[in-house]
Curated annotation (Swiss-Prot):
List of catalytic residues: 253 (proton acceptor)
Keyword Acyltransferase: yes
Stated role: Catalyzes the N-acylation of UDP-3-O-acylglucosamine using 3-hydroxyacyl-ACP as the acyl donor. Is involved in the biosynthesis of lipid A, a phosphorylated glycolipid that anchors the lipopolysaccharide to the outer membrane of the cell.
Domain of life: Bacteria
Pathway entry: Bacterial outer membrane biogenesis; LPS lipid A biosynthesis
A Pfam family assignment: Hexapep
Protein name: UDP-3-O-acylglucosamine N-acyltransferase
InterPro entries xrefs: Hexapep (IPR001451), LpxD (IPR007691), Trimer_LpxA-like_sf (IPR011004), UDP_GlcNAc_AcTrfase_non-rep (IPR020573)
Keyword annotations: Acyltransferase, Lipid A biosynthesis, Lipid biosynthesis, Lipid metabolism, Repeat, Transferase
């Protein structure tokens, strides 16, 4: 059951209305009994008034005994199903489920077009139409924020920063030396645009190198909680359109991340490395500095990238090697350990 303290249930929704709403994403059988659907639940918990979904085949065993009135399933699903459950077949069942969530629920919390009294907004700052600025937020000189944007409580937007339309900057975010596009989401605690880790050692002293670059973030980007993105040292740090960056990711100075790439939690990318378009870095991946990862390449979780990776390659391990080599290494290592233990 969705907690009503945080989300409003917009139901009940008729099953036929759900099928109509999802018609661009699903194939639905003829619905003879237009039952009222009250909620979305997992297969194990769904009742005869609920709808469910299946995107991971590991859970298909629950379809046999589920009580759900309907279930969104992959288009080619052929497993055993409760005969009372209507199947809505989707090319991408997880995507269809996401659309269904939007049809059923809305956040309780709203953001009126308002600047809270405890917020500080510099006179030279430009705030667009229908924006919300939360308690104790700070917006410094010459900041520009586009229409329909949200700046939540305690966030700091430094001098000269530009943020596009329909941005959502959650609580306690710090943004400096940055130009940010439209439809960007930055989750709580993220730090954008601070100095990178640049020092020169001379006569036993570590001398800080002043960073003159900025951070450029494209359109429709999401940046996770407590992620840190350093501004460029001389060349800018660039996050292109459609990127998704998870929580607790570190992106070093002058890194470039190509369009549509995904970086999972606790990954770290050292300075001046370039990640191509639509790449995927798994959790805890480390990328050394000044490397190039080609378009569409993937690095398995905890991979350590110490050399360039060609476009489309899949690698794993530390140091990272082609994924099949990594699997072979793992098997051989296990065999050696078992042999020594006998």
């Amino acid at each position: 059951m969705v907690n009503s303290n945080f989300y409003r249930n917009l139901g009940p929704r008729k099953l036929m209305a759900i099928a109509d709403f999802l018609q661009d994403f699903i194939e639905a059988p003829k619905i003879h009994e237009d039952v009222a659907i009250h909620d979305i639940k997992i297969l194990q918990e769904a009742s005869s008034n609920d709808i469910s979904f299946l995107s991971n085949i590991k859970y298909s065993r629950f379809l046999k005994n589920t009580k759900a009135a309907a279930c969104i399933v992959p288009k080619d699903f052929t497993g055993e199903v409760n005969p009372n459950t209507v199947l809505l077949r989707a090319e991408n069942s997880y995507f269809a489920y996401g659309k269904l969530i939007d049809f059923f629920y809305a956040p309780v919390k709203s953001y009126p077009a308002k600047i809270m009294k405890s917020a500080y907004v510099a006179e030279s700052a430009t705030i667009g139409k229908n924006c919300y600025v939360g308690h104790n937020a700070v917006i410094e000189d010459n900041v520009v924020i586009g229409d329909d944007s949200i700046i939540e409580a305690g966030s700091f937007i430094g001098t000269g920063v530009v943020i596009g339309r329909n941005a959502r900057i959650e609580s306690n975010v710090s943004i400096n030396y940055s130009v940010i596009g439209d439809d960007v989401v930055i989750l709580s605690g993220a730090k954008i645009g601070q100095d990178g880790f640049g020092f020169s050692t001379e006569k036993g002293m570590h001398h800080k190198i002043f960073h003159t670059g900025i951070v450029k973030i494209g359109n429709n980007v999401e940046i996770g909680a407590n992620t840190t993105i350093d501004r460029g040292s001389l060349q800018d740090t660039i996050i292109e359109d459609l990127c998704r960056i998870d929580n607790l990711v570190q992106i070093g100075h002058s890194v470039k991340i190509g369009k549509g790439s995904i970086i999972v939690a606790q990954a770290g990318i050292a300075g001046s490395s370039v990640i191509g378009k639509y790449c995927a870095l798994g959790g805890q991946v480390g990328v050394a500095g000044h490397l190039y990862i080609g378009d569409g390449a993937q690095v398995a979780a905890q991979g350590g990238v110490a050399q360039n990776i060609e476009a489309g390659k899949i690698v794993g391990g530390s140091p990272a090697v082609p994924i099949m080599d990594w699997h072979r290494q793992s098997i051989i290592m296990k065999q050696l350990i078992n042999k020594r233990s006998k």
